């Protein structure tokens, strides 16, 4: 599904489902030649014709996000788990194609040590890249998409490598310490050559309202200067250097509202009221097993404004006692669900849509709203199922997962700008 989305947006958007099914049946080399290899990376590495073509073509940059939490120089923690092989296959691809620049992106958990006898996978993978092929100088960075213009708090780790001969010929060096991003007006010291420079100040950082305020119907559309500037960036994918759509219906794609039961909508409205009242949503996790527990909670809520009314005007409760009864009826063991705030950036976009409730409408977020938080243009189309069951997610990548697994285009653009400057300097020195 994710490969189909890539093909539709980067190669040919007239490709039908039948065309895609036929494409999946093509050989490895045919897919590589077409620009999208859907086969496993191991198949590409084992296909000599494909690899010879890539080597002869010459590759400047290799970018990827192999699952690295289980990476170890001493061996694989679980040899039966194919995901533990992917970092090594990625490094093999780098070794054989000799790109000038390598970029690896992953979650912050990659920095955790799993054994007192080993460094973290993040540290070990940096060393492995240094030793790959002709060698690379390596810069580790901790970045947050928020510092690059995304309306979302999204911390990530990245490893950026520049081939040693290219680095030495042009005087580029990496710092020994991990570099951490910050807002443009809060950067402490110089930004390393192998680090993406932040692009927004704290005041310029967009909020949930800036990102999706025009996609809701409860309040007037939020159209301040910051919102206007943000949405202008996302109007078309052509503004990002991507191919223009062959057709445009005028409708924003992937903006299908999810349907919920009456009980679920009640819970969502309660989450919204709790947020606006500055009350933790964890009150829904409290076990109200006796009258004393009810009285204690009612006393805690007594200072809140009543009647309790949700953002869409629905009355939730007339007083604290009625609200406690509602909380008892809507009790849940789910700890991660909460309503987003209009005046803050979004939480980290994840692959499952159920954790975050819309700020003013009793529903979860749409695929498009999540894509806005990431920074995808409005005419960037996600194809396939919207969501799927947990077991099928092992081999299917539905739309919500495609969005949640992606690198924010805002951060990706900053990395691309850094690479363009590096390679531009290399080309200038070579001429």
Q: At which residue positions do the language-model features occur?
A:
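Glycine-rich phosphate-binding loop and adjoining beta1-alpha1-beta2 segment
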Residues: 1-54
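Conserved beta-strand scaffold positions in the cores of enzyme catalytic domains, especially
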Residues: 35-38, 138-140, 348
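Class I S-adenosyl-L-methionine
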Residues: 47-56, 74-321
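Residue-level detector of short, conserved catalytic/binding motifs and their immediate flanks
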Residues: 60, 157, 347
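N-terminal Rossmann-like NAD(P) cofactor-binding module of classical short-chain dehydrogenase/reductase
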Residues: 60-63, 103
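Glycine-rich, N-terminal phosphate-binding loop of Rossmann-like dinucleotide-binding domains
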Residues: 66
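Active-site beta-alpha loop architecture of Rossmann-like, nucleotide-cofactor-dependent enzymes
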Residues: 69
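C-terminal target-recognition/interaction regions appended to catalytic cores
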Residues: 230-431
């Amino acid at each position: 599904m994710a490969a189909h989305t890539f093909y539709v947006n980067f190669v040919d958007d007239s490709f039908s489902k039948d065309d895609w099914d036929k494409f999946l049946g093509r050989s490895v080399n045919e897919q590589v030649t077409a620009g999208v290899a859907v086969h496993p990376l191991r198949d590409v590495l084992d296909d000599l014709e494909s690899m010879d073509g890539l080597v002869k073509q010459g590759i400047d940059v290799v970018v990827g996000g192999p699952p690295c939490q289980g990476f170890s120089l001493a061996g694989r923690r679980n040899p039966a788990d194919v995901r533990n092989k992917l970092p090594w296959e990625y490094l093999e691809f780098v070794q054989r194609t000799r790109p000038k620049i390598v970029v690896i992106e992953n979650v912050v958990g990659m920095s955790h040590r799993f054994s007192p006898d080993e460094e973290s996978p993040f540290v070990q993978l940096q060393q492995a890249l240094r030793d790959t092929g002709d060698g690379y100088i390596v810069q580790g960075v901790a970045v947050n998409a928020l510092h690059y213009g995304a309306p979302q708090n999204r911390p990530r780790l990245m490893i950026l490598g520049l081939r040693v001969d290219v680095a030495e010929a042009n005087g580029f060096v990496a710092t020994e310490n991990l570099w951490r991003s910050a807002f443009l007006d809060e950067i402490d010291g110089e930004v390393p050559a192998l680090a993406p420079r932040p692009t927004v100040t704290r005041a310029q950082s967009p909020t949930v309202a800036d990102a999706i305020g025009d996609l809701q119907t409860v309040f007037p559309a939020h159209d301040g200067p910051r919102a206007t500037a943000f949405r202008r960036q996302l109007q078309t994918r052509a503004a990002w250097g991507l191919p223009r759509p062959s057709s445009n219906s005028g409708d924003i794609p992937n903006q299908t509202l999810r349907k919920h039961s009456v009980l679920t909508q009640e819970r969502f409205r309660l989450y919204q009221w709790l947020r606006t009242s500055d009350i933790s949503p964890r009150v829904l996790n409290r076990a109200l097993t006796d009258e004393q527990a009810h009285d204690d909670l009612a006393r805690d809520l007594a200072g809140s404004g009543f009647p309790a009314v949700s953002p869409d005007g629905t009355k939730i409760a007339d007083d604290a006692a009625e609200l406690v009864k509602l909380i008892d009826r809507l009790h849940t063991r789910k700890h991660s669900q909460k309503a987003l705030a209009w005046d803050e950036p979004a939480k980290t976009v994840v692959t499952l849509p159920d954790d975050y409730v819309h700020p003013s409408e009793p529903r979860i977020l749409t695929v498009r709203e999540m894509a806005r938080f990431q920074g995808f243009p409005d005419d960037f189309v996600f194809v396939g199922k919207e969501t799927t069951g947990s077991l099928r997610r092992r081999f299917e990548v539905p739309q919500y997962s495609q969005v949640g697994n992606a690198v924010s285009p805002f951060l990706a653009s900053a990395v691309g700008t850094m690479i363009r400057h590096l390679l531009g300097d290399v080309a200038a020195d070579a001429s």
